[in-house]
Amino acid sequence: MNGIIITNQDIGHNAYKIKRFTEEGNKLGISLSHYINDGSLALIKDNNIEVKLPKADFIIYLDKDIYLARILEKANYRLFNHADFIKMCDDKMLTNIMCANSGIKMPKTIAGPLFYSPKLEEKNLKFLDSVISELEFPLVMKKVYGSLGLGVYLVNNKEELISLYKENCRQPLQFQEYIATSFGKSLRVLIIDGKVVGAFQRYNTEDFRSNFGLTATSKEYPLNDKFLEVANKIINLFNVEYAGVDFLFGENNEPILCEINSNAFFEEFEKVTNINVARLFMEMVKRKIYE
């Protein structure tokens, strides 16, 4: 069996995933080759898709380029994860919409209106009054697309809100209720092949964001029934093959969904939990390809 790993040009944390998938794949008789998405892997030519990749049984897609993902799927490559799931997770607002009306607790959330005019006028700021009225301060403003805590802001007053909005108004945004009980801490639940495999808690004493990319510390966390129940709702709703689900802690440690990561890093998870994530992932891939 042979497969392909695709990453974007900034390999970063994916270097560990490439190494571990290759190690565990070799043990299972799976050969992996790595390609960087530099814009040259596929195109539409003479009205048809042309892919400049070798034949492969599957692709481990560690990029968020939905266009390439959809092109590869249309060319009959099997992607882990599917393009639709990557898109649904990468867009935080789509994640919230998908989870609404499903018994999954989330922060109160408002989608920012898209802005196209060349000049920002006073009338374009009026909706911020309804954001303030609905959420109150402090509140959280997020870029819809982002990872490792980048583009997430804790906003304490109207002046900060207007300033941050002016800086970011030409990209999709969302505004959320601030969960004070979860300051600097969150829970990452890892899911493989539709099953919860473990969890670890992250701490950051210097910032309201707990993301490991912001130098948080972590420890293994024994999941209780409340978190497992919500995690399983997410598994069923999204038909999850692989994901890291991040929860905030509400009152009495109530699980509140923060986001779902389709390309979740797992280096820290393996170190903290001693769970062989790469092995479980490659076993899933092998089983699904042979089904």
List the model feature ranges, each with a label.
Residues 6-118:
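Conserved N-proximal alpha/beta basic substrate-recognition cap immediately N-terminal to
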Residues 81, 191-192, 249:
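Generic beta-strand structural signal
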Residues 148-234, 238:
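Phosphate-binding site of ATP-dependent enzymes
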Residues 268-274:
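A short acidic/glycine-rich loop-to-helix N-cap element
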Residues 189-191, 253-268:
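A short beta-strand motif that forms the metal-chelation/ATP-contact edge
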Residues 208-257, 279-291:
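A long amphipathic alpha-helix within ATP-dependent nucleotide-binding catalytic cores
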Residues 139, 197-198, 243, 256-258:
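Protein kinase-like catalytic core scaffold
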Residues 3-8, 86-184, 225:
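Active-site nucleotide/adenylate-binding loops and adjacent lid/helix of ATP-dependent enzymes
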